[in-house]
Regions:
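Short, low-complexity, polybasic intrinsically disordered segments
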Residues: 198-216
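Short, solvent-exposed amphipathic alpha-helical segments in soluble enzyme
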Residues: 14-18, 91-93, 136-137, 206-212
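Conserved RecA-like ASCE P-loop NTPase motor core of nucleic-acid helicases/translocases
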Residues: 1-3, 72-80, 191-193
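Conserved RecA-like P-loop NTPase helicase motor core
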Residues: 42-53, 101-200
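Conserved helicase motor "Helicase C" RecA-like lobe of SF1/SF2 P-loop NTPases
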Residues: 74-105
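Interdomain hinge/linker at the junction between the two RecA-like core domains of SF2 helicases
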Residues: 4-65, 213-216
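Phosphate- and divalent-cation-binding pockets in alpha/beta enzyme and binding domains
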Residues: 9-10, 83-87, 127-130, 201
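Gly/Ser/Thr-rich loops at beta-strand to alpha-helix junctions
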Residues: 4-7, 30, 80-83, 126-127
Length: 216
């Protein structure tokens, strides 16, 4: 059982399983999706070509989100370590708690146990992390979580199958979205800074309609 297979036919293809061996059962989500809307921003194109130009513009937007949720815990998904470091240095807010490869688990535990409204900032908390209830009342997705084409294996697979790259990006995006909504009556608002995200969501064939309808 999984909440993030998206397209079971393509999923089986990625696993090398014949489609005839798959029987898909779909169930409606028990979550109230009105409790986890997606809000987007205009004017911040964080593509490889324009991120240096537009990243400085995002700082005030992130500060405004942090101020709006000044008494709540949240998380900023930066996708890359470079973006994490940039935001820590330029947002310059004592609530931010980051990590490196060596202390990821330790910092996550520190974040969970703290009574302060800390904000976890990370490139790698988009899956396998459970932040129910007051542990995450808001989250910021800084940029589209495209797989890193600097990785040779990813580049080879993307060149061989463009759909695979779109699928992996959609999968990462929907998994990231799910970090703050962990049980039926939970609630969490998601902010997408990268202005390319709404178009990506609207045009990606792997993302379900219920997800596309979350943008407010």
């Amino acid at each position: 059982m999984s909440a993030s297979i998206l397209d079971y036919k393509f999923f089986s293809k990625c696993l090398g399983i014949d489609e005839s061996e798959i029987y898909a059962i779909r169930k409606a989500s028990p979550f109230n999706l009105d409790n986890n809307p997606i809000k987007t921003f205009d004017g911040f194109n964080l593509s490889h070509k324009t991120i240096k130009r537009d990243a400085p513009k995002t700082v005030d937007a992130i500060k405004s989100v942090l101020d709006k949720h000044k008494n709540e815990k949240g998380i900023i998904h930066t996708v890359s370590g470079t973006c994490r470091d940039y935001l820590i240095d330029n947002v310059n807010n004592e609530r931010l708690i980051g990590h490196d490869v060596s202390n990821r688990a330790e910092q996550l535990e520190k974040f969970k146990k703290s009574d302060k409204p800390l904000v976890l900032i990370s490139p790698s908390m988009n899956e396998g992390v459970d932040l129910p209830g007051d542990l995450c009342r808001f989250q910021i997705i800084y940029k589209i979580p495209y797989p890193d084409l600097a990785d040779k294996q990813i580049r080879l697979r993307a060149n061989a199958d463009e759909d695979w790259y779109d699928y992996k990006t959609a999968l990462s995006l929907i998994q990231t979205y799910g970090r703050g909504m962990r049980f039926k009556d939970d609630y969490c608002i998601t902010y997408c800074i990268d202005s390319r995200i709404p178009e990506f969501i609207a045009s990606n064939s792997f993302l379900p309609d219920w997800f596309k309808n979350l943008i407010v």
